[in-house]
């Protein structure tokens, strides 16, 4: 079981949320990334995510993304590897990862607030955008990302995989965002590895192997 976070994509140019220069230092998440704000200040939320999407588009996978993808391919014949990422970019897919699940949604798909269907994103978000499934508009089409106040994706089946996993690897995540922060405590894996940049963010008491440094330095062979 691989869990990845913002630190994995930071070296590709996508800003993290909680470091010294992170997004939450510039914006109040309660204002721009919550379900309540989507209802009350829809255009502001759309502008925020349009900017994030625009900034992410030129970014490319780094050596750590590629290392994870190659690892998944190398062990696929004899080991079932599930990669759950907290990132909303598609750099893991671009690197060739055969199996990636986005816990917090992704930038590549949109969600209709009326019919609840998801579909490939087309351009940037605006009031006039029409849902290709039901035809709704007037801010009906929103980013398919998990906002504060919403339940992360996959929580109906992820706990089952955590209990079955023999190895748990955490890559580039601060371990402060729930429910993902609890995954290392929920897993039955005998080997629990943490690969992260800052060892001082929180105590890694449940990990039994730790490697501190940039993902591009700690992951590639």
Residue spans of the language-model regions?
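Conserved catalytic core of sirtuin-type NAD+-dependent deacylases
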Residues: 1-221
């Amino acid at each position: 079981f691989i869990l990845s976070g913002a630190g994995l994509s930071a070296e590709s140019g996508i800003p993290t949320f909680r470091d010294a220069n992170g997004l939450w230092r510039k914006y109040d998440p309660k204002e721009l990334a919550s379900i309540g704000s989507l209802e009350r200040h829809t255009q502001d939320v759309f502008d925020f995510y349009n900017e994030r999407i625009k900034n992410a588009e030129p970014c490319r996978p780094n050596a750590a993304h590629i290392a994870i993808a190659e690892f998944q391919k190398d062990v696929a014949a004899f080991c079932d590897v599930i990669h759950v990422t907290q990132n909303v970019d598609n750099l893991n897919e671009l690197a060739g990862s055969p199996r990636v699940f986005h816990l917090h949604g992704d930038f590549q798909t949109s969600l209709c607030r009326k019919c609840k269907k998801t579909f490939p994103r087309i351009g940037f978000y605006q009031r006039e955008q029409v849902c290709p499934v039901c035809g709704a508009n007037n801010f009906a089409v929103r980013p398919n990302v998990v906002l504060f106040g919403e339940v992360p994706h996959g929580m109906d089946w992820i706990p089952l995989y955590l209990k079955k996993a023999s190895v748990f690897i955490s890559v580039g995540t601060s371990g402060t965002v729930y429910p993902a922060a609890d995954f290392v405590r929920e897993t039955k894996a005998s080997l629990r590895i943490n690969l992260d940049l800052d060892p001082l963010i929180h105590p890694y008491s449940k990990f039994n192997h730790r490697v501190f440094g940039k993902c591009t330095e700690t992951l590639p062979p």
